[in-house]
From Swiss-Prot:
Residues the entry annotates as binding Mn(2+) 2: D521, D523
This protein's name: Xylosyl- and glucuronyltransferase LARGE2
Enzyme Commission code(s) on record: 2.4.-.-, 2.4.2.-, 2.4.1.-
Topological domains, Cytoplasmic: 1-8
Functional note: Bifunctional glycosyltransferase with both alpha-1,3-xylosyltransferase and beta-1,3-glucuronyltransferase activities involved in the maturation of alpha-dystroglycan (DAG1) by glycosylation leading to DAG1 binding to laminin G-like domain-containing extracellular proteins with high affinity and in a phosphorylated-O-mannosyl trisaccharide dependent manner. Elongates the glucuronyl-beta-1,4-xylose-beta disaccharide primer structure by adding repeating units [-3-Xylose-alpha-1,3-GlcA-beta-1-] to produce a heteropolysaccharide. Supports the maturation of DAG1 more effectively than LARGE1.
Subunit structure, interactors included: Interacts with B4GAT1.
UniProt entry tagged with the keyword Ubl conjugation: no
GO biological process, one term: muscle cell cellular homeostasis
Glucuronyltransferase activity: annotated span: 373-715
Main location: Golgi
Organism listed in the record: Homo sapiens (Human)
């Protein structure tokens, strides 16, 4: 006999089993879609919504209450519906995915980096980036990718200037100018053997693995060659304002911020002749394109609708001024690509803009160094120098007391040259660029430096990705800095515990464009007249190929945060006599500048020659092709001294200028100075670097290097600095 209550329990269990079976029969299709979704996530965009599914049909077009108002193409046959049909399989694990981007100028280059970060964060496949760039963007991005050393990423560059004649005949009102038309010529510009490519605008951000987008090529019919998301505004309906006359489009038209191109089919179909004929015909009645290449793509698709494959709306969520994208993202559980296609970019008016802005800022400020780590293994050519670097790192001993120094020397820092818009100075035979380096805690020096030095500057900044954005806002908010287009800022991204001072100097020095450079430090303010005086002195002394010399600019310092900066040598000497100024490091490290002979400088009327002496580290003006700084010296100590030793070994004259001066302003000691003062191990490691430096000096200069041996053997005093 069953215990009381057992029949009731068995009945309940049977009822539950029946309900589960019924649920499986009802929702099995949805579960099947989840299993077939590329990338393995629940929520395939091609499935009808179940309880846990996104409400985005296979083409991304929203129906019923969620449909776009006034949608002229809402018929069931217009949307490429698969009704939960088979989802495209993901591409093979190691298939190379091709991505094309048109990029021109400084600002667009910064946008590309954020886009690439978002792609790299999610990607599981090797990538080949095809970048159509102007000279400015190529210089920036070539340097960046070379120093980034991301595994399984290839980059090819194409000269935008060579493509301009193919589109320059098209009048265009869009802010992107001619570059906004260059996607039209990609089938002929990219290699003939390239059959498929994803084309992206610089203002898109990925929220998913790009291989899922690549997988949508499998949806193409035999005749389709262009994959696009429908335009998420009423622009092509012509009802945004009175007398608005857009280019012809199929229904709402399509947005070209994200494109899948079957290049092979477009070439076979005669794409170049097709878009040219269409554009010429439409321009007979329309004055210009308003949305650049997008207008012409839409006009061609209107005439040849069989070319287009509609993509789900989540692959191009458009945040334009008149966007209706909310109808897409409010129904979707898994957005794929965010597109800031308003000229206002992050300042566009949208009630959900904070959500999208924060998502964008995540990648804008994301540490790009973390993307160097390869989380998947695919056979690919390693970045140049990567194998040698890994071998050198593998030989380091983590138990070595100087391990930090050794590791920092081998670190390859990401470098973003000309981070902000920069206009190179017009060529002048005796022009001088001020070269310096700084970190975030010295930004406050920039405005004063710009007031003191009216000439070109090349400055290297050691920043994190997040600090780089703070720096950008700092410059934009400063009328003094924003007005100076002749100041080139180069961001070297922070990595490692020690300050790579000489690597920073070399970056700034390499980017100087004038024949001569003034090698300074950020804590110094030069005399107001120094720029003009240096150019005149270079000409008078006949420097250049006839005479190899380093012009010494005498250095002074003040311990006061506020003082009246001298406008002449006479005023400076008065402040020196009054005790307001001192010769630089007179109290702590007089050997560093004693050879300048300040007593002689007081009376000098003409340049005079001085001899090198141990620990001499003056600030000098030299030709741009001077020896580079020794990058082994990181942190504090001997970084400038070693450079002056090299100049002397290469027989540079040291000439002190009688009317030149620069003044050091007080500041809190850096972390590296503090470590130098407090740590005997730090000083021992510095001595080891000095010994290695002399060995290399002897190999290069032979017996002539013996004169520097006593200086190199002197121990470093912890009181220095």
């Amino acid at each position: 006999m069953l215990p009381r209550g057992r029949p009731r329990a068995l009945g309940a269990a049977a009822l539950l089993l029946l309900l589960l079976l019924l649920g499986f029969l009802l929702f099995g299709g949805d579960l099947g879609c989840e299993r077939r979704e590329p990338g393995g996530r629940a929520g395939a965009p091609g499935c009808f919504p179940g309880p846990l599914m996104p409400r985005v049909p296979p083409d991304g077009r929203l129906r019923r209450a969620a449909a776009l108002d006034g949608d002229p193409g809402a018929g069931p046959g217009d949307h490429n519906r698969s009704d939960c049909g088979p989802q495209p399989p993901p591409p093979p694990k190691c298939e190379l995915l091709h991505v094309a981007i048109v990029c021109a100028g400084h600002n667009s280059s910064r946008d590309v980096i954020t886009l690439v970060k978002s792609m790299l964060f999610y990607r599981k496949n090797p990538l080949h980036l095809h970048l159509v760039t102007d000279a400015v963007a190529r210089n920036i991005l070539e340097t960046l990718f070379h120093t980034w050393m991301v595994p399984a990423v290839r980059v090819s560059f194409y000269h935008a200037d060579q493509l301009k004649p193919q589109v320059s005949w098209i009048p265009n009102k869009h802010y992107s100018g001619l570059y906004g038309l260059m996607k039209l010529v990609l089938p002929s510009a990219l290699p003939a053997e390239l059959a498929r490519v994803i084309v992206l605008d610089t203002d898109v951000t990925f929220a998913s693995d790009i291989s899922e987008l690549w997988a949508l090529f499998a949806h193409f019919s035999d005749t389709q060659a262009i994959g696009l998301v429908e335009n998420q505004s009423d622009w092509y309906l012509g009802n945004l304002w009175k007398n608005h006359r857009p280019w012809p489009a199929l229904g709402r038209g399509f947005n070209t911020g994200v494109i899948l191109l079957r290049l092979d089919r477009l070439r076979q179909a005669g794409w170049e002749q097709m878009w040219r004929l269409t554009a010429r015909r439409e321009l007979l009645s329309l004055p210009a394109t308003s949305l650049a290449d997008q207008d012409i793509f839409n006009a061609v698709i209107k005439e040849h609708p069989g070319l287009v494959q509609r993509l789900p709306c989540v692959w191009n969520v458009q945040l334009s001024d008149h966007t209706l994208a909310e109808r897409c993202y409010s129904e979707a559980s898994d957005l794929k690509v965010i597109h800031w296609n308003s000229p206002k970019k992050l300042r566009v008016k949208n009630k959900h803009v904070e959500f999208f802005r924060n998502f964008y800022l995540t990648f804008l400020e994301y540490d790009g160094n973390l993307l160097r780590r390869e989380l998947f293994v695919c056979p690919s050519q390693p970045p140049p120098g990567a194998e040698q670097l890994q071998q050198a790192l593998a030989q380091l001993d983590e138990e070595d007391p100087c391990f930090e120094f050794r590791q920092q020397q081998l670190t390859v820092h990401r470098v973003h040259v000309t981070f902000l818009p920069h206009e190179p100075p017009p060529p002048r035979p005796h022009d001088v660029t001020l070269v310096a380096q700084l970190s975030m805690d010295r930004l406050q020096m920039l405005e004063a430096l710009c007031r003191h030095w009216p000439g070109p500057m090349s400055l290297a900044l050691y920043l994190t990705d997040a600090e780089a954005q703070q720096f950008l806002h700092f410059v934009e908010a400063s009328p003094v800095l924003a007005a100076r287009q002749d100041v080139a800022y180069h961001v070297v991204y922070r990595e490692g515990p020690l300050y790579p001072v000489n690597q920073l100097r070399n970056v700034a020095l390499a980017q100087a464009l004038t024949p001569y450079v003034f090698l300074s430090d950020i804590d110094f303010l030069p005399a107001y007249s120094l720029y003009d005086y240096l150019r005149a002195s270079i000409e008078q002394l006949g420097l250049g190929s006839r005479r190899k010399a380093a012009l010494v600019v005498p250095a002074f310092e003040t311990l006061r945060y506020r003082f009246s900066f001298p406008h002449s040598k006479v005023e400076l000497l008065a402040l020196l006599d009054a005790g307001t100024l001192y010769t630089f490091r007179y109290h702590e490290w007089p050997r560093g500048h004693a050879p300048t002979d300040y007593a002689r400088w007081r009376e000098a009327q003409a340049p005079y020659r001085v001899q090198w002496a141990a620990n001499y580290e003056p600030y000098v003006v030299v030709p741009r092709d001077c020896p580079r700084y020794d990058p082994r010296f990181v942190g504090f100590g001997w970084n400038k001294v070693a450079h002056i030793v090299e100049l002397d070994a290469q027989e540079y004259e040291l000439l002190v200028l009688p009317e030149a001066f620069t003044i050091h302003l007080p500041h809190a000691p850096s972390l590296d100075i503090s470590r130098f003062r407090s740590s005997p191990t730090y000083r021992d490691c510095l001595q080891a670097l000095k010994d290695e430096f002399h060995q290399d000096l002897s190999r290069h200069h032979g017996a002539a290097a013996l004169k520097y041996l006593p200086a190199l053997q002197q121990p470093q005093s912890p009181a220095r600095g």
